[in-house]
Amino acid sequence: YYPEAEEALRATEGFKALNSEQQAGILEAFQRNYKAKLNPITEDTMPGELSNVISGRVANAFDLGGPNFTADAACAGSMAAIQSAAKGLLDGDYDVAVTGGVDRTMGIATYTKFCKIGALSPDHSSPFDNSANGFVMGEGAAILVLKRLSDAERDGNKIYAVIRGIGASSDGKGKGITAPNIQGQIRALRRAYADASVDPVEVDL
């Protein structure tokens, strides 16, 4: 509730011309209607306002006691989180990691900005294609539960995939901050192959 809006209403000539009962009725209706437009504010409201609360809320809800933080690396946010989680497992910081990514378009500001800089495709997404002319915004969430392979095998867990290596890079100065730089992508791939001790010629897509 913004008292400034009420003060502006009080200052109008039309409001001043009303008797005290009419003024009180209008102010009461003003506050009631304004508050009706706002969702109740609880501790679950904060993840939508402060990204660093997201991981903390998950830890709180599931009573998790290890380190928790939110990684923001734009499109690579999920990979950055997975890389950090995997490193912590290998370093013995914890035995299980819950990691992943979530993206929601909470308002029109982000959409408008991407439109203004020409980052959004006017028709559709065409990854790895010469006709690519931008990206299409989407929403979604995905969570992975990670363990060291030996621990998962010992505990009889169902194993969906094994992470053999991870590579990351920044594109540096290229076409633009929103456009991929092929050299940066190559660096990431080389680091992933090296981390996994795999020769690229052995990989079949």
Residue ranges and their predicted role:
Residues Y1-L205:
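Condensing-enzyme catalytic core of the thiolase-fold
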